[in-house]
């Protein structure tokens, strides 16, 4: 300062370049050019801090829309990610599946779903979800965070000649998590293992907003071990109430 003929710099922004600095991305920077408002020029920096690795996934993935030849893996993240699913009949020789929309990966939302197809009926498969936070997504510049991976999970596809299976059906839970936990404990005590789980209405009641809906869905999915057991959520009359109703 002074602004029109600067002799000194009194504003600065500094970041100590250690390992933690890798978790910070500079989005933009500049100088506020307002000579009539001040006798010096303030500088600014817009930065983004990466999400902690253990907080990138909202919860475990869950299995949806299973058929004799495929399944959909769904999950939410706390930041937009570049994501894919590794899968195979073991955890060593695996393939990769990801979602493409008109030839591009849809990296613009925290809702993620990846379809795994062309599988063999009756086979057991293992899978895990991998993700990199999209820290910067510009036309000619991309910055991704480190790769975060879930634990390995598994599922078995139904075969056309399957005659017997076990389905567990919950309904009207109305956010009474203690009731669901008690019912799940009864199943465990009696050695009953579900091949499919159905939430038959009024299990995600009166969703207030997106965060509430995501939280409630993931509570149900964890309770049903939906990372390994395919689930179906059926809309009831209470799911269509409130401002974020389905």
Where are these regions (language model features)?
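Residues at the C-termini of beta-strands that transition into short coil/loop
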Residues: 17-18, 28, 159, 171, ...
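Active-site beta-strand/loop signature of hydrolases that rely on acidic residues for catalysis
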Residues: 1, 14, 39-48, 75, ...
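Active-site neighborhood of divalent metal-dependent phosphoester/pyrophosphate hydrolases
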Residues: 162-181, 188-246
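Metal-dependent phosphoester-hydrolase catalytic domains
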Residues: 1-55
